Structure formats: structure tokens, C-alpha cells
Amino acid sequence: MPGSEPYGRLQYREINGKRMAYIDEARGDAIVFQHGNPSSSYLWRNVLPHTEGLGRLVACDLIGMGASDKLDGSGPDSYHYHENRDYLFALWDALDLGDRVTLVLHDWGGALGFDWANRHRDRVAGIVHMETVSVPMEWDDFPDEVAQMFRGLRSPQGEEMVLENNAFIEGVLPSIVMRTLSEEEMIHYRRPFLNAGEDRRPTLSWPRDVPLAGEPAEVVAVIEDFGEWLATSDIPKLFIRADPGVIQGKQRILDIVRSWPNQTEITVPGTHFLQEDSADQIGEAIASFVREIRAGDNLHREAAPEMNSAS
């Protein structure tokens, strides 16, 4: 049975006047785990132990999520992609992640991490990604029931579904985990969104930003931009595919993601929140991937003096 206890100790940093929460354990080259909607660093609790001893382990809570502060006076224009990006990237800057960063990305953490990597190409040692927002999507890329849910969330009904009824936590989250989440686990996931109304706004803004049928255009542009780079970048990549998956289950999406160069693929059981069903396999795969990167770094360092002496 997967463990329900959080990993590590939450720390806090003030970013743009708001307190943001994060885990920051050990030292060395940073391995940065980034969640999406509606989760938090708690999602990685059973994955992180497998990477102990491999470097500095960092997992941040997005603004308004997990243990991070809520925004003041939020409304329909709050917690969208670019605002989230501003807060997260400022936190990463404040944490001084270094120049050999391995990114481990899920859901909207994927779009954010790919975006950061595209902007800091010379600082990225490797990228691990799973069930990420990574490609502009069409409605038929989703299973019918998921498409119907997103249509509701993106309609005027979305406020009632999420702000009043907490649909993403009480309905969506448990429905796309293969096992049944324990009550203790659900308590952790519910905690940031116990209060009805604007405290739940992040879990509504995110699905309204999913790049569907060309909208919202400003998010599609970001994803197209980093997608062009990923299609040609030789940075080492590990694609952890969920079987059957949700947002990367259709062949069109898989074909695009699989075309990225210098990439290894493994498959684990899971729908969307695969960390809740296959944490051990995911953690072991990440650890193996990081060890391979480290071995390549060592070979490069050993070869450099020989090249210099030969010249």
C-alpha cells in the first residue's frame, strides 16, 4: 500500500509578497519535481525516496496550491498560466537551482518545466516527463467523458462545479487514479481547498488554460514555442508513459512526444495521476536515468583533460 505521509519538511520563501512552500533536501545537482493541477508536492511523496543520494531534491507548491499562499482579491483572471509561471520561476530563481538541473514534470508542471528549460537550455541536464501538458490539443484527443468534463469547466457552469462543489478534488482526482485513495491521502489533497469560493480558483483556472482547439492563444503560443525546441533538442529525456493514460493516451499525442530526440520511454500502469499507482517504478526509473546522466558527465570531465593535452 502506498504511503500517505508527506515527504521531507516544507520550507517557505516569500515571492512577490506571498509565501510559497517547497521541499529542499540534500545537496548536489538539483532534481526538481513539479506538480500540476490540483495536486502539490505531496504527489511525489512515494517517488522522492528512490532518488535520495543522487543530488538535491526540490519540489515546489504552485501559488494557491499545496501549502503556498492564496492570492489576494482573486477572480476569473487569476491563477492563469503566466501568473503561475511568474511565481514559480521567481521561486526557482530564489532557490538558485544551479547549472545541472534535472526536471521531473507532470501535468501543468510539464508545460512550466518545458518552458523554463527552453529559456535556460544550458542549465538543463535532463528532463523526465509523464502525462504532461506538452502539445496543443484537440477535443477528440480526450476520452469522451473527459472532454465532456472540460466543456463544463470551461463554461459558466465551471464556477459552480469547482468553486462550490470542489469537483476537481472530490470528483476528477480520485476518478483518474486506478486504486482507491485512502481517506488520509484525500485529507492532504483537500486541505488547500477546504473553503468554498476563491480558495478553489486555481483548480478552475488551470483547466480553462488547457490548450484546446487553439484557445487560449497565449498558452498555445508558449507550448508551440517549447515544442519546436523539444523536437530538436538532444538534452536527455525520459518519457514515463501511463497505461492507459489520459492526456497522452491518444496516438496523435504519443507520436509527437515520441519524436523528441535522445529519449528513452518506459510504460507503467496509471491513468493521469500515475504517481499514485506506480510510484516505485517511476522512482526507480528516474534514479536510473539520473545515474546515467551523472555517468555521462563524469566521462565528459575525464575526456576534457585528454583533449586539452592533445591540443
Curated annotation (Swiss-Prot):
Residues 30-148 form the AB hydrolase-1 domain. It holds the Pfam family Abhydrolase_1. The active site is at 107 (nucleophile), 131 (proton donor), 272 (proton acceptor). Coiled coil: none annotated. Keywords: Hydrolase. Catalyzes hydrolytic cleavage of carbon-halogen bonds in halogenated aliphatic compounds, leading to the formation of the corresponding primary alcohols, halide ions and protons. This is Haloalkane dehalogenase. It comes from Mycolicibacterium smegmatis (strain ATCC 700084 / mc(2)155) (Mycobacterium smegmatis). The gene is dhaA.
